[in-house]
């Protein structure tokens, strides 16, 4: 499957990218190379090959989740420049 310059322009528009003429030429060639490689991979006989979801065995390296005590509301808000009841008050950032 050969990718066309028009297809690269279409993908760039979808991604909201503005590409120069040189970039369009470069990316057309690069995407064509990638698709050629994928076609080679698709042609391989993978019958009887077990799918691999992870190359190495997965282990949970994190500790067990245990509840512990924490500081109180007043201590947490002690240095807050603005507060509203028992919450931090921050400037409005979205209109």
From Swiss-Prot:
Question: Which sequence ranges are marked TM in the entry?
Answer: none
> EC annotation?
6.3.5.-
Any one GO BP annotation for this protein: glutaminyl-tRNAGln biosynthesis via transamidation
**What reaction(s) does this enzyme catalyze?**
L-glutamyl-tRNA(Gln) + L-glutamine + ATP + H2O = L-glutaminyl-tRNA(Gln) + L-glutamate + ADP + phosphate + H(+); L-aspartyl-tRNA(Asn) + L-glutamine + ATP + H2O = L-asparaginyl-tRNA(Asn) + L-glutamate + ADP + phosphate + 2 H(+)
Keyword entries, A-Z: ATP-binding, Ligase, Nucleotide-binding, Protein biosynthesis
Note whether Nucleotide-binding occurs among the keywords: yes
Q: Which GO terms describe its molecular function?
A: asparaginyl-tRNA synthase (glutamine-hydrolyzing) activity; ATP binding; glutaminyl-tRNA synthase (glutamine-hydrolyzing) activity
Q: Which top EC class is named for this enzyme in its record? A: ligase
Family in the record: Belongs to the GatC family.
State its role. Allows the formation of correctly charged Asn-tRNA(Asn) or Gln-tRNA(Gln) through the transamidation of misacylated Asp-tRNA(Asn) or Glu-tRNA(Gln) in organisms which lack either or both of asparaginyl-tRNA or glutaminyl-tRNA synthetases. The reaction takes place in the presence of glutamine and ATP through an activated phospho-Asp-tRNA(Asn) or phospho-Glu-tRNA(Gln).
Subunit info here reads: Heterotrimer of A, B and C subunits.
- This one is known as Aspartyl/glutamyl-tRNA(Asn/Gln) amidotransferase subunit C
Q: Which organism is it from?
A: Citrifermentans bemidjiense (strain ATCC BAA-1014 / DSM 16622 / JCM 12645 / Bem)
The organism's lineage is: Bacteria, Pseudomonadati, Thermodesulfobacteriota, Desulfuromonadia, Geobacterales
């Amino acid at each position: 499957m050969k990718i066309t310059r028009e297809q690269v322009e279409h993908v760039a528009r979808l991604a909201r990218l503005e590409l120069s003429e040189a970039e369009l030429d470069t990316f057309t060639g690069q995407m064509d190379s990638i698709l050629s490689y994928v076609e080679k991979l698709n042609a391989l006989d993978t019958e009887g090959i077990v799918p691999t979801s992870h190359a190495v065995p997965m282990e949970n390296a994190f500790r067990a989740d245990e509840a512990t005590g924490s500081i109180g509301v007043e201590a947490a808000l002690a240095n807050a420049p603005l507060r509203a009841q028992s919450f931090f008050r921050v400037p409005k950032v979205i209109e």
